[in-house]
Amino acid sequence: EGEILNKRKIVGLYDPEENGFDLEMWNNTEPKKIFQLSEKINNMVLSEDAKNIYTKLLLTNSYSPKDGIDEKVFLSIKSDWLIKFRDIDLIKEYLKKNIDIKKNEQLTVFVLNELFSINENKQACELLEELNTSFKDNYLTKFSIYCLIYLKKNEQASLRYDLEKELGYKEPFFEKKF
């Protein structure tokens, strides 16, 4: 009693029942074939319909395959697909629904870079605030503190920086700021 039976995470965006899929849809699939097929698909020019079908398949809530595939590789397949098509709104939605996935730092960096590059600083900072995550990535840590300052939450920014400093993070810019 109280035992966790399945330690694999459910990752995705769409309800499997709405798309005719199942949470365990990857269980009987050979992991190596998933990776090879995704590599092949990523190099193809797909019609909009094919792209939408593959997106639904990849982003439907499911467990990763049981046998032999590293969960990071499986998540990487999803991240690479999202980045390839640069749909910022879809990526943001995926990030918000899968906050606890470490591999999402790559997606978070991608979205932030895209938003900052078009001068959407407020939108980038609001996303970081909504994710409200401690990052292992120094780049994301820096921007999460910067965004608190940008959003005029200096006290929170100072507190966040102090907490990060205790974990070994150091940034000369913030040392001067606080």
Where are the language model's segments positioned?
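Alpha-helical segment of the N-proximal tetratricopeptide repeat
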Residues: V73-D87
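Generic helix N-cap/helix-start motif at coil->alpha-helix transitions
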Residues: G68-L75, D100-F110, S134-F143, Q156, ...
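Long, His/Glu/Asp-enriched segments that create or flank divalent metal/ion-associated functional microenvironments
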Residues: I10-V11, E164-F178
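N-terminal alpha-helical interaction modules that lie
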Residues: E1-L75
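Residue-level signature for tetratricopeptide repeat
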Residues: W81, F110-L115, C147-L148
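Solenoid-repeat scaffolds in large eukaryotic assemblies
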Residues: I88-I91, N121-C125, N154-R160
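Solenoid-like repeat scaffolds
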Residues: G20-T29, N43, L58-G68, E93-K103, ...
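Structural motif corresponding to the intra-repeat A-B loop/turn of tetratricopeptide repeats
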Residues: F85, I118-N119, L151-K152
